[in-house]
From Swiss-Prot:
Belongs to the MnmG family. Its main location: cytoplasm. PANTHER family: GLUCOSE INHIBITED DIVISION PROTEIN A (PTHR11806), PROTEIN MTO1 HOMOLOG, MITOCHONDRIAL (PTHR11806:SF0). It holds the Pfam family SAM_GIDA_C. Homodimer. Heterotetramer of two MnmE and two MnmG subunits. It comes from Sphingopyxis alaskensis (strain DSM 13593 / LMG 18877 / RB2256). GO terms for molecular function: flavin adenine dinucleotide binding. GO terms for cellular component: cytosol. NAD(+) binds at residues 273-287. This is tRNA uridine 5-carboxymethylaminomethyl modification enzyme MnmG. NAD-binding protein involved in the addition of a carboxymethylaminomethyl (cmnm) group at the wobble position (U34) of certain tRNAs, forming tRNA-cmnm(5)s(2)U34.
Length: 619
């Protein structure tokens, strides 16, 4: 690397947020520098070797719909597919895969190498370079290299001020064996940005050759044909099984007797951890009445013996970890390869960001991933795409990419973060989306790809695939929307309703016992339609009556969303607002009345006062 170089966008960090940010900016035509401590580790899965899940699978598919990399890499590395909530409606089903760590990292690095607009820079990000006017001008590396750019995306993960804990051990770093980013953390704190600490953890890694698999409950890969990426229709990697075991009373006794050695209970770690992924010591403490907790044994790859025991994240001392492990069925003789640990790191209060994920007080700086207070690969990837795209669009003087919560889970997450902030690592859940009936994982491309194409965020090759997909979708719709004749009921074994209601072919699928397979008797052409596309059309029809009930609510909300609020609005000058309301609104700085309505604690009366005040000023 030369002593200086000029780019449009600099991305700091080569994890899930950083790679998607760099890729999005490059797809929009920006010259991108991707700065990483160690480029050989770009795309590493730091914790669990899995992509997707409940809510998270929706984010994965939405990133894919906008031509991101995560789902493609997941398919290239998937050694175990599983559709979570498969027995429930499609709106809350979550596609999830178990990945071969090496294959996933290799897939990301292959995609990176093929992207001409990205230059990978090895080094430590030491300080943001600011112009005299306080706007971003680039980045200084620890070795003295100066990178010039008008936009920087910080995707620092757990490395920003990272510190590791295991029992009495304390280590500086963002991941075991890797240094943290402390100079950059110091600069951000010195800039008086609102910052705090959060915590996450990881379980020990086990030697699969020392596990008695024969005694455990197997969990096979799904036999279906679904894939992570809409643009991929084949599974190419050999499939393996995972296994399930449980902790027990003896496991809990060992943990309880050693809580005084856990940094979570000694006060060494004061930061909040992820609510939906607690450590095993936290589980034992909070749920003392439980006689056991499930542990999912997940192989980390096809050519490794390492196994990830999902469900027992811990920062207990290594000797306690091993003793606890050997009380679990199937693990009585297990060998621990790497002990678990916890990591505490800096994050920025996401309420300091606007909806593009730009730092309001530091124009030209965008943030994505754990620096914004989230947890999870999928949450990070989605933010990376938004931040990277908006950084490039800003440099080009174009309108930003804003995804609404009514059209995407990405929009839900960004809205939640910039309005509500976080007190613990934020994880996406389907329950967070009030429009979840329409935001299914299977229709992400139909919802979002047109927007990506319009922006230039979707490559021509993917746009061509989308056009073919939509043509196929239209053909499926035409076949299924055709009217049903009286004789058709008997032809597929259904009783004649006798209610005189005119029905379409697709309506027959609401009858008990009716299936798409039986419908092919009436419509043989259905056999030639891609099953994923056909399923999406059928689910659209199933959900249509329920979605229709929400339309009035959506129109009412849209009316509120349309009322823009002045970014410099003096809430203290609005009559009828309590001091508490003024403080909440001044901190969150909502951009629309609809956003103001979702700020925790803001009352309908306060919204009315703001609306009246805004309309008076606009008159």
């Amino acid at each position: 690397m030369h002593s200086s170089a000029t780019f449009d966008v600099i991305v700091v960090g080569g994890g899930h947020a950083g790679t998607e940010a760099a890729a999005a900016a490059a797809r929009l035509g920006a010259r991108v520098a991707l700065v990483s401590f160690d480029p050989t580790l770009i795309g590493t899965m730091s914790c669990n070797p899995a992509i997707g899940g409940l809510g998270k699978g929706h984010l994965m598919r939405e990133v894919d719909a906008l031509d991101g990399w995560m789902a493609r890499a997941a398919d290239a590395a998937a050694i175990h597919y599983r559709m979570l909530n498969a027995s429930k409606g499609a709106a809350v089903q979550g596609p999830r895969i178990q990945a071969d760590r090496k294959l996933y990292r290799a897939a990301i690095q292959t995609l990176l190498a093929a992207e001409e607009g990205i230059t990978v820079v090895a080094g430590e990000a030491a300080a943001l370079r600011l112009s005299n006017g306080g706007r971003i001008a680039g980045l200084d590396l620890a070795d003295g290299t100066a990178l010039t750019a008008r936009a920087v995306v910080l995707a620092t993960g757990t490395f920003l001020g990272g510190r590791l804990f295991r029992g009495e051990e304390r280590m500086e770093g963002g991941r075991i064996g890797e240094a943290g980013s402390h100079r950059l953390a110091g600069q951000l704190r010195a800039a008086h940005l609102p910052m705090a600490r959060l915590k996450t953890g990881t379980p020990p890694r086990l030697d699969g050759r020392t596990i008695d698999w024969a005694r455990l409950q197997e969990q096979p890969s799904d036999g279906g044909r679904w894939t992570c990426s809409t643009w991929n229709n084949a599974r190419t990697v050999p499939q393996i099984f995972c296994a399930i075991t449980r902790t027990n009373a003896e496991s809990h006794r060992i943990i309880a007797e050693n809580l005084h050695r856990s940094p979570l209970f000694t006060g060494a770690i004061g930061a909040a951890g992820p609510r939906y992924c607690p450590s095993i010591e936290d589980k034992i403490h909070r749920f003392a009445d439980r006689d056991g907790h499930q542990v999912f044994l997940e192989p980390e790859g096809l050519d490794t013996h390492l196994v990830y025991p999902n469900g027992i994240s811990t920062s207990l001392p290594a000797d306690v970890q091993l003793a606890m492990l050997r009380t679990i069925e199937g693990l009585e003789a297990v060998e621990m390869v790497v002990p678990g640990y916890a990591v505490e790191y800096d994050h920025i209060d996401p309420r300091a960001l606007d909806r593009t994920l730009q730092v309001r007080a530091m124009p030209g700086v965008w943030c994505a991933g754990q620096i914004n207070g989230t947890t999870g690969y999928e949450e990070a990837a989605a933010q990376g795409l938004v931040a990277g795209a908006n950084a490039a669009l800003a440099v080009q003087g174009r309108e930003p990419l804003i995804l609404d919560r009514s059209e995407s889970y990405i929009g839900v997450m960004v809205d939640d973060l910039v309005l509500q902030g976080v007190t613990e690592p934020y994880r996406m859940l389907t329950a967070r989306a009030e429009y979840r009936l329409r935001l299914r994982a299977d229709n992400a491309a139909t919802r979002l790809t047109p927007k990506g194409i319009a922006l230039g965020l979707v490559r021509p090759a993917t746009a061509a695939l989308f056009a073919r997909r939509m043509a196929e979708r239209a053909r499926a719709g035409a076949l299924l929307e055709a009217p049903v004749a009286t004789a058709d009921y008997g032809a597929i074994g259904l009783p004649l309703p006798g209610d005189g209601i005119a029905r379409r072919r697709i309506d027959l699928l609401r009858f008990p016992g009716a299936t798409v397979e039986r419908l092919t008797i009436l419509v043989p052409e259905i056999e030639s339609i891609d099953r994923a596309i056909l399923s999406e059309v059928v689910e659209d029809a199933h959900y249509a009556p329920y979605i229709a009930r929400h339309e009035a609510e959506l129109r009412a909300l849209a009316a509120n969303e349309a009322i823009l609020l002045d970014p410099a609005l003096d809430y203290a000058a609005i009559g009828g607002l309590s001091r508490e309301m003024v403080e909440r609104l001044s901190k969150a700085r909502p951009e629309t009345l609809g956003q103001a309505a979702r700020i925790d604690g803001v009352t309908p009366a306060a919204l009315t006062a703001i609306m009246v005040h805004s309309r008076r000023r606009a008159a």
